[in-house]
Regions:
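Small-residue-biased structural context
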Residues: 1-184
Length: 184
């Protein structure tokens, strides 16, 4: 179960919407990893591979996923909100709902982090904790499934359609800078 956070993305920062989509694939991957570890180990001792997979997934959600949320909430969504067109109002209401979902996900990730650290430190989880861990992972998978669908099928295409190329380029620079990188 070796997992690498740094797998080569399909997009570069010159395609910021593609970069956001790549992040969604990583979120799905690492939630699947947590679900797999939870199902295999059932709160018991973790094999070396399970431990490494758990640590990698937790690290991704602690660092990478928070940057992704900032990419959307600080880079993409404000640009969409700055466009004053009546035909975009319904979509912007969806953007508001997405931000609410991000807050819900943040709370879920915090609890998963706490339980995952506990599991790694103690070597096992009590029944109530392992049940809660599995529930949280399932809840986050459901939450992200809906969130990602709205973003990829509605919000991202709208962004490409309404944002000028210069704004998309600026987004790419901001996303790269958030990761301490020069834009490719």
């Amino acid at each position: 179960m070796p997992i690498a956070i740094g797998a080569k993305p399909k997009s570069t920062f010159t395609d910021p919407i593609g970069s956001l989509t790549d992040c969604h694939r990583r979120i799905e991957l690492f939630l699947a990893v947590l679900a797999q570890v939870s199902a295999q180990a059932r709160g018991g001792p973790l094999s070396r591979e399970e431990r490494e997979a758990m640590e990698t997934a937790l690290r991704y959600f602690r660092a990478g996923a928070t940057k992704h949320t900032a990419d959307e909430e600080e880079t993409l969504f404000p640009r969409l909100r700055s466009i004053e067109r009546p035909d975009l109002r319904a979509m912007l209401e969806k953007v508001d709902a997405l931000e609410d979902q991000h807050e819900e996900a943040k709370r879920g990730h915090a609890e998963i982090e706490q339980l995952g650290r506990k599991w790694l430190a103690a070597g096992s989880l009590a029944l109530v904790d392992r049940t809660r861990f599995a529930e949280l992972v399932a809840q986050l998978r459901d939450l992200y499934r809906g969130n990602i669908a709205v973003e990829e099928q509605q919000v991202f295409p709208m962004a490409v359609a309404v944002l000028p190329r210069s704004e998309l380029e600026a987004m790419g620079r901001e996303i790269a800078a958030r990761r301490g990188l020069q834009r490719e």
